[in-house]
């Protein structure tokens, strides 16, 4: 019976949110008021609210603000265009391609280099770059922020670029750009400016729960997963010259790919159902 009661409260509130009767930014009624409305105990109401929090449709509430219906202004990331085709880095205005793409989607965007460090390769990064676990690499961490009228600035993405030491230490005009603690922009990108033309990308996407560090930086609600996009850059010799690992709140980002479909011809011995 207890399960049925909290589910009844959950279903009613979720329906109000889905129909827009409780709109983004609206205050969710207090536990005491909901208990009176439905005629159930506050503990039953709390179970329903906890489920809505885990679904990511209401905030967990803090202090006098209480719980609110979450705003869902999605950030679109066009990965077909990102780092492909006409490279949109703008050295004159100190804007790289991510910022240019964010601007094209209507966002004001900025990024900071939060950290440049020589670290031992974690297992996952070692697999991406095909190096031994513990190999010393340079990690360059950028924090990417977006805002627009009516939407306060928020961290959209943690972008970590991992590079072999032999590449990270290369210099242009006496400066190693991958070791700089500030944003560096070159026509065609840093790696091309260093002499590494990436001829192939391998992308891997996963959804997982955030680490404590990621949850703190992204301000994700309890129970909210993060998305992780890893792009491995490979040069003409087959060498993996870097991996860019981007982590973002799973309820704030939409990834887009446009993929051409090659013409396929049926064969006599293979049946197809399209």
Locate each region found by the language model:
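HTH-adjacent hinge/linker in prokaryotic transcriptional regulators
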Residues: 4-10, 36-37, 50-133, 169-182, ...
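Residues in the helix-turn-helix
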Residues: 44
